[in-house]
Curated annotation (Swiss-Prot):
PROSITE patterns (alphabetical): DAPB
UniProt cross-references to NCBIfam families, sorted A to Z: dapB (TIGR00036)
Gene name as annotated: dapB
The protein's role, per its UniProt record: Catalyzes the conversion of 4-hydroxy-tetrahydrodipicolinate (HTPA) to tetrahydrodipicolinate.
Family to which the UniProt record says this protein belongs: Belongs to the DapB family.
UniProt keyword Nucleotide-binding, yes or no: no
Keywords annotated in UniProt: Amino-acid biosynthesis, Cytoplasm, Diaminopimelate biosynthesis, Lysine biosynthesis, NAD, NADP, Oxidoreductase
PANTHER family: 4-HYDROXY-TETRAHYDRODIPICOLINATE REDUCTASE 1, CHLOROPLASTIC-RELATED, DIHYDRODIPICOLINATE REDUCTASE
Organism, as annotated: Streptococcus pneumoniae serotype 4 (strain ATCC BAA-334 / TIGR4)
Protein name, entry field: 4-hydroxy-tetrahydrodipicolinate reductase
Lineage per the UniProt record: Bacteria, Bacillati, Bacillota, Bacilli, Lactobacillales
Protein residues bound to (S)-2,3,4,5-tetrahydrodipicolinate: 146, 155-156
């Protein structure tokens, strides 16, 4: 039996890529799409909804969300309330929101996934960086994205920093008496690690994790050149959350 999928934010670039992926997979069935600004009632024969409230009681298994940080939490909560296992690629969640959604998913006995990055290479980068941070506590992150991305730093950069902080010696990166001649020049501070965000046209999603030690350096980098790189992870997420009974944060928990 096919997994019935709703895609919220289907008009965006990630939403469109997700739609095409679902439409070409015989194990998945795209049953509805959501966008508050869409004027048509159908898209490729699929019903279009402008208000998520109209999807209450709709028959579907999975809610895929590529919307905006402003509505992502509300959408994920709505999905869980209505029996849809959420697969969320929208970033901008606070740690408190993630914890609350995990608890609510357990109460609803529903699986779910919030993933800062669906590219398998990016997930591996985070794992490699976590291993390296045990031995190289001096580290900075540079994340680079297209200039339409609204949140900074990226969810991937934050997740990477969180994972490294679990194993890394907590030290302040840089000189103790350093002075920023322009505010923000040293980037965001996460447990002593610095995170730098680049936003330029032509980019998709890229990240470097740079480690330094006496007389040596180590650089880990991942590049997504096309949004199709995320679809393997989205596909995996859809097929896995229907088997689970709790929401997880990070694709690595489903691998």
């Amino acid at each position: 039996m096919s997994i019935r999928v709703i895609i919220a934010g289907f008009k965006g670039k990630m939403g469109q890529a997700a739609c095409q992926m679902v439409l070409t997979d015989p194990d998945l069935d795209l049953v509805a799409v959501l966008d508050p600004f869409e004027s048509e009632s159908e898209w490729q024969g699929i019903p279009v909804f402008k208000d998520k409230a109209d999807l209450a009681g709709f028959e579907a298994d999975v809610w895929v969300d590529f919307t905006t940080p402003a509505v992502a939490y509300e959408n994920t909560r709505f999905a869980l309330e209505n029996g849809f296992a959420p697969v969320v690629g929208t970033t901008g969640f606070t740690s408190e929101e993630i914890a609350e959604l995990k608890e609510f998913s357990r109460a609803q006995d529903l699986g779910g996934l919030i993933a800062p990055n669906f590219a398998l290479g990016a997930v591996l980068l985070m794992q490699f960086a976590t291993q390296a941070a045990k031995y190289f506590p001096n580290v900075e992150i540079i994340e680079l994205h297209h200039d339409k991305k609204k949140d900074a730093p990226s969810g991937t950069a934050i997740k990477t920093a969180e994972l490294m902080a679990e194993v890394r010696e907590s030290i302040q990166q840089g000189a103790a008496d350093e002075e920023e001649l322009i505010a923000g020049a040293r980037g965001a501070d996460f447990d002593g690690m610095r995170i730098h965000s680049v936003r330029l046209p032509g980019l998709v999603a890229h990240q470097e994790v740079i480690f330094g030690n006496q007389g040596e350096g180590l650089t880990l980098r991942h590049d997504s050149y096309d949004r199709i790189s995320f679809m393997t992870g989205v596909n995996l997420g859809i097929k896995e959350v229907v088997k689970r009974h709790e929401l997880v944060y990070g694709l690595e928990h489903l691998l």
